[in-house]
Amino acid sequence: MKLYQPAEDSFFLAECAKHYCGNMALEIGTGSGIILDTLSQNFNSVVGTDIDYVSLQYYKSNLPKNGALVCCDAASALAIKFDFIVSNPPYLSDHDKKNKDRTINGGPTGIEATLHFIHSAVLVLQKRGKILTIISSLSDRSKLDKLIKEMNLKKRIVKVRKLFFETLYIIEISFDIA
């Protein structure tokens, strides 16, 4: 697997993530580690997961002192709860099945990787915790809205950035509690 090189979306998500703080933060799909680096400045402890062992080895030498890395699918190997979870999942659609690059291929409609990450993340999210993620106007966002409703979650659009071929949305997801 190749390492995802930070691009516009990674920097956009990191820019928004720096406004959150707390005790425990998790980044799902750590890749190059730029978002985990941002989280390490405002959280007591940070954990990064990635399904690709090579990516974790690449980042290991730059790991902050308050950080840990776990090789697993999303949050599947974790049992502790987090105040804040962030992920820049692959979100481009592969409707023509030609794109085999898992670092950018989000599934047939572009949202499947995001749905998988959310299913995993809510299991390790504190009751009043927040999830921050990024989605594209090119993805099937209606599937995300359906999942959020089914799981009794709520979403808020934090920030929007229009690019020449798509619009990126930073989405905050939390439990819908009174």
Where are the regions a protein language model picked out?
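Short amphipathic alpha-helical segments
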Residues: 60-61, 97-100, 144-146
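C-terminal lobe and adjacent flexible extensions of AdoMet/dcAdoMet transferase-like proteins
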Residues: 171-178
